Amino acid sequence: MVRILIVEDQKIMQKYFEYIIMQEPEFRHVQTVSDAREAVKICDYSAIDLVIMDVQTFHNHDGLSAGKEIREKYPYTKVLIVTSL
């Protein structure tokens, strides 16, 4: 079971990622948040296998910095950085 955290501030993209995750029986959607700092906090108390993170989230928090922090603290957690142009 792959536990997934979605970090995305746009509701339509949140729903899209949640829908995709639900299609795969091996995936388990743990939580969706709109803030990169909140994602780091969640990783502090939840065993997350994969973080799907927007490069720039609500309040302009930097997804790259948060992703790097998660990878340093939890090396077995994979971080997928996404963006839309």
What are these regions (language model features)?
Residues 32-50, 58:
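Acidic, metal-coordinating helix/loop segments flanking the phosphotransfer/catalytic sites
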Residues 41, 64-76:
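Short amphipathic alpha-helix used as the core "switch/output" element in two-component signaling
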Residues 54-67:
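Conserved phosphotransfer microenvironments
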Residues 12-23:
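Amphipathic alpha1 helix at the N-terminus of the CheY-like receiver
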Residues 2, 47-49, 73-78:
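His-Asp phosphorelay/catalytic-motif detector in bacterial-type signaling
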Residues 8:
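Conserved acidic carboxylate
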Residues 1-3, 12:
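Non-catalytic signal-transmission and effector/linker regions of two-component phosphorelay proteins
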